[in-house]
Each structure stands twice: as structure tokens, then as C-alpha cells.
Amino acid sequence: MTNTTKPAKLNHVAITMDPRVLDDQGRADVLDFYGEVFGWREGDNTGETGNPLILTTGAFGQFVYLLPADPPMTAPPLDHFGILVDELDELHAIVTRAKGYQAHDDRVKIIDVHARTTHGPTHDYTLTSTYIGFVLPLMVEVQHLVRHEHGRF
């Protein structure tokens, strides 16, 4: 039997946060950083319980949902969620903006850009990525993925 159902798409990440991090100043800091670096904006939380901060990514139905909670989520330093960019220049521009922000706010964490190539039977794949963190318990991995026919880089 052939399955013609399209696979479901990931549409959001929900993270519980220390309520003190999501006070008025904390929300302003989160909105400023993620707005400046990633272009994310505050979404409408009307009707939501617990006064979450919703960061919309600009793509329809995709968002990061930050909910004040006690206890908040804790995670090891490399736990993350990922976003995919279409152009390598976009990835480098995001890193440049994050480094600019880091120059005046030491809460910004950046793991520098790294590329690796995986060899497949018919194609090779080059994954370029970086990790960026700011006050959330999870970092954001920014990825750019290119598929190459064998012998064509």
C-alpha cells in the first residue's frame, strides 16, 4: 500500500522559562536580541494562559513559545533546536549580528561556524552550521544544507 499522506511539519518549540527572565525587562531583552539577530517578532498571546512570550519567525505557523514556569526548563549547554536558512550568506549574516550583540552583552553565546561533508551513494551533502544562545535554556542551531552530485563541489 502506498502512503500518499504528506509528513507532518514541525511548527513550534515550547520552552518553560524562569518567570524572572520573562519580566518586563527580560521580555524586552529577548525581543531585542531575537528580533535583531533572527528577525523574530512578538506574537499575540491573547487567550493564552500564563502570559507566554511568543516569538514568530516570519514563516506562517512557526513560532517559539516561552512560558514562565516554576520550575523552568533546564538543559545541558549543547541542547538546542534548529532552523534552516536557504543561503549560506544568511547564516553568516546571522552570526555577524549575534557577534555585534555579543560585543555589548556577554549573555550571548556563539559556537563558531563549522562545515562538514557527508558522502552518500549518489550525492554528497555539505552541512554548515553555528549555534547561538541568549538567555533561553536551548541554543538555536542555524543550518545551511547543500546537496552536491558526486564530483561537483
What is each model feature region?
Residues M1-D23, M73-F153:
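Vicinal oxygen chelate
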Residues P19-D23, G61, D89, L138, ...:
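Residues that cap or initiate secondary-structure elements
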Residues G39-G43, D70, R116-G120:
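Intrinsically disordered, low-complexity segments enriched in polar/charged residues with Gly/Pro
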Residues G43, G47-L91:
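A short, hydrophobic/aromatic-rich structural module that often spans a beta strand
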Residues G43-E48, D86-E87, V95-G100, D112-R116:
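Short C-terminal domain-edge/linker segments immediately following a structured domain
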